[in-house]
Structure formats: C-alpha cells, structure tokens
Amino acid sequence: MRRIDFRFAELRANGRKALIPFITAGDPSLEATVPVMHALVRAGADVIELGVPFSDPMADGPTIQRSSERALGRGAGLAYVLEAVHEFRREDAATPVVLMGYLNPIEIHGTRRFAEAAVAAGVDGLLLVDLPPEEADETRAIFTEVGLALIALASPTTSEQRLDMLCSTAQGYLYYVSFAGVTGASNLLDTHAASDRLRQLRQRAGAPVVAGFGIKDAASAAAMAVDADGVVVGSALVAALAEADDVRSARERAEAFLAPLRQALDQA
C-alpha cells in the first residue's frame, strides 16, 4: 500500500499523471509475464495491474476473457500470479503492483491467508471486481491489517450513496470506469461525460482517481488524463501482447505499445 501512496505523491509533486497498464498473468505465456512487467516499467508504467485469470470474468470483454482462458489453460492460477510478483520484486522494489480479479479464488484460498501471502510476494493492492462496497468491510479490515490496499471501482451508474461510501473508504486509488460496460468497448467512451464525473470524484475522494475502460491509444489516454490522476490501459495492450511469438517479442510489443502513451501523458 505504501508503494502506491508514495508513487502518487511523487507523481503529484512532479505534475505528472499515472500510467497504469493492465496485463493478464500468464498471457501470452507463463515465461513472458515478468519480462513484460519489467518492459512496461522501462516504457513508463507507474503502477502495474496484473490480472488474476478467472473462468468467469463477468466485467471483461472478449479480449481479456480470451486472454484469461489462455492463461488458465497454461496453469496460471493464484499461486503462479503470486510467484510472478515475487520474481518481479527481485529486480524492482519500487513499482506498485495491484492484482485485479474476482472474489472466488481468494475465498477458496482464504482471505487472510491470501492477503498475507500477497504481501509476502510484494503485492500492494487488490481490485476485486465483484466485491460490493457494502460487503467489503471485513475484507478491507484484513487487507489494511497486513498492508494491502483495497482498490474501489466506481462507474457512471454508481449511486450517490455508494459513491459517498467509496470516496470515504478509498485506499490506494479510486478506479473510475468511464462507461457502464465491459472492458475493451472503446466505442462507448464519452470523454466529456467522464471528465465531468472525474472532476467531481477528485474533489470528494480521499485518494487519487484514475480512469479506465475504453482507453486504447495515446490520444484517448491524454484526453482522459486531463481530469484524472492517471489512466489505466488494458484490452488494447492485452490484444497487442496476444500476437507475440516469444518472450522477446512480448517485451518489444509491451514497450512499443506503452511508450507513446507515456509521451502523450507527459506532453498533455
């Protein structure tokens, strides 16, 4: 959690926006995950969101669903994800890593047992897509005790009552879903409506606010970052990595995809 707080404080002090790439652990291969994470940092990533493969990713569009299926087919379960973070930490002790996934694998593992293992591996936060904020108190308490941030999600359809709850309990950063849909549906992105909401959230939230869903290139990243503390890019990056033939190709694709977004954010 402290790595996330430090990174956003550092960015704020330098007048920069956070660039947060999402990749699925285990895709395009088990061997590529950690090298791709390092490549993303070289290309300008400030935080890495690492997707935990799940058999029923309801919030994800076809690109990430297929990515998750491929990763599961290779055996990329929760243990693999934590080992990947542990390996990443051998060379990078500074870049925050947030796991994004669903409740079921964690509940099977045991929430406290998982949380302790995640911290030991070097994880900084969790974004649990299907954990309602009204039911998050126990999980948040366990995570806070061990030093994990429970990242919250808000969307255009989130009620004012729920927004008040999310803003008052936000840890790490608040992830604003720029439209009501699944990941990758960039045709639904309305930057004007999202910008209005982002400005409101930044005034209310006790943590930085980042925007995700529908960000696919440098132009959309720069547009969304104007009124946010950072942006998350996922499906477009996952699609680019899916075409990689080997680890070297995956690294090169990761850097080639992310570097223009970093440049656009720094010039905006």
Curated annotation (Swiss-Prot):
Reaction it catalyzes: (1S,2R)-1-C-(indol-3-yl)glycerol 3-phosphate + L-serine = D-glyceraldehyde 3-phosphate + L-tryptophan + H2O
CDD domains for the chain: Tryptophan_synthase_alpha (cd04724)
EC numbers: 4.2.1.20
A molecular function (GO) term: tryptophan synthase activity
One cellular component term from this protein's GO annotations in UniProt: cytosol
UniProt keyword Lipid biosynthesis, yes or no: no
Pfam family, one: Trp_syntA
Pathway: Amino-acid biosynthesis; L-tryptophan biosynthesis; L-tryptophan from chorismate: step 5/5
Keywords in alphabetical order: Amino-acid biosynthesis, Aromatic amino acid biosynthesis, Lyase, Tryptophan biosynthesis
Active site, per annotation: E49 (proton acceptor), D60 (proton acceptor)
Sequence similarity: Belongs to the TrpA family.
Protein name per Swiss-Prot or TrEMBL: Tryptophan synthase alpha chain
Native source organism of the sequence: Xanthomonas oryzae pv. oryzae (strain KACC10331 / KXO85)
Encoding gene (name): trpA
